[in-house]
């Protein structure tokens, strides 16, 4: 696929004391749309596809329909795998019916597979997202949920959140981030024996700028 992960902007937000992180294809107004349509009280959303609550629960918001094909479970697992989340603490919710979750990434993904010249991709991206937003489209079909939302969205969101949580833990402990590891929704510093749950770090992590192109796991790491 010829679409770079760098075309996907990740955002984070404080949601009731937790961390919400999502992705959008070059949509700088995504955070404004979210706050105008979804925010309640002090909660703030920024294209939220992944949420971590203080009690260490992880919620994955999916903008595709589940019709028995297993896409909801698969997409949540792709995010959870990159996040190193404890699966028993992961829940799945259908994304709200707002243009924030419009599935314009499907058209963008197909354009990449069809070999559209790179100089046309910015126009394709802008047009696809605008059409999807106008129709509030949360489309399901063409095996696109896993290929595009999963590979370009859920994996990137999970990897970005993991890096943010590690950064927060490392700063709190005063240790290098590369000395920290993650497993089952916890960040560990083995040298000192310290551990923090994702829920404990979520509020601080929400204040960080998400990495634009986080490092994804190799197949051998799954």
Regions found by a protein language model. Give the residues of each.
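Cofactor-binding beta-sheet edge motifs in enzyme active sites
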Residues: 1-222
